[in-house]
């Protein structure tokens, strides 16, 4: 089953190390409205567990995670 959603904003965090991808994701989501989807791109392997923990802690929905080589792409839906 394919996941279907549209991206409202993109955030490029390539080259940034923990905790910057999470902090920049939080800042971007703070400016978005409920229901919008953020695409965050990171090259930090630590961002995979960090984003899962961030989603669980904040309640924002982690819709999908893609790995393309050394790049991680996260789709996060603002829920509140």
Stretch-by-stretch model annotation:
Residues 1-8, 79-80:
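Compositionally biased, disordered extreme N-termini, encompassing classical targeting presequences
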Residues 2-3, 30, 64-66:
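Short secondary-structure boundary/capping segments
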Residues 7-14, 41:
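Short amphipathic
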Residues 10, 17-19, 49-50, 72:
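Helix-centric, low-specificity signal for extended rod-like, repetitive segments
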Residues 19-61:
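Amphipathic, hydrophobic secondary-structure cores in small proteins
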Residues 52-80:
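C-terminal structural segments of small proteins and small subunits
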